[in-house]
Amino acid sequence: YASRPIPAMQGLDRGERVIYVGTFSRTVAPSIRMAYLILPPALLEVYRAKFGHAAATVSRLEQEALRRFLASGAYSRHLRRVGNLYRRRRDALVSRLEPWGEVRGAEAGLHLLFTLPGREEKELVAQAARAGYRVRGLGEYCLKARPIPGTLVLGFAGLAEEKAEEAIAENRDFLDA
């Protein structure tokens, strides 16, 4: 959100070895159960030989509707719209969190790291849960490295801009502790 997207891996790949696997469930709607696989030309025939017999479980009608959605440019417009929406949500949350701690990793993605200096991660997670928020501590994502103490992983995709101020106001005691 803070800069232009990084180039696609396929565009950087000189040996045609990049494979893309994804789904439209997160970018369009959870009910769309369609995935995609983009293979380099050299692997396409191997894939067809090994897996060509597997029948698609998605109806042709749904596939055609998605094909038209993609071909019309509507999907690209949708991604731009939601990107702008997520940027506004991120900005609203970051501006309200910065007075209490350090925000990291907000440049891209739908999560950020929020550090409250001098606080214990487990207690922060427990306090957030008591206040009705589902958050995780950074330590849950670390196998060997020691996480930054007092750091929460906060998602903002589902946080409406106007709710950011409300959430901070409701939790001033938690933030000030």
Regions found by a protein language model. Name each.
Residues 1-27:
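Active-site pre-lysine segment of PLP-dependent enzymes
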Residues 15, 41-46, 76:
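Short helix-loop capping/hinge motifs at secondary-structure junctions, enriched
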Residues 35-41:
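Short beta-strand-to-turn element immediately C-terminal to the catalytic PLP-Schiff-base lysine
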Residues 38, 113-117, 155-157:
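Short hydrophobic/aromatic beta-strand micro-patches
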Residues 47-54, 70-94:
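Structural signature of PLP-dependent enzymes
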Residues 67, 83-94, 102-115, 127:
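Conserved glycine-rich beta-strand-loop-beta hairpin in the small C-terminal domain of fold type I
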Residues 130, 146-177:
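PLP-dependent enzyme catalytic core of the Aspartate aminotransferase-like
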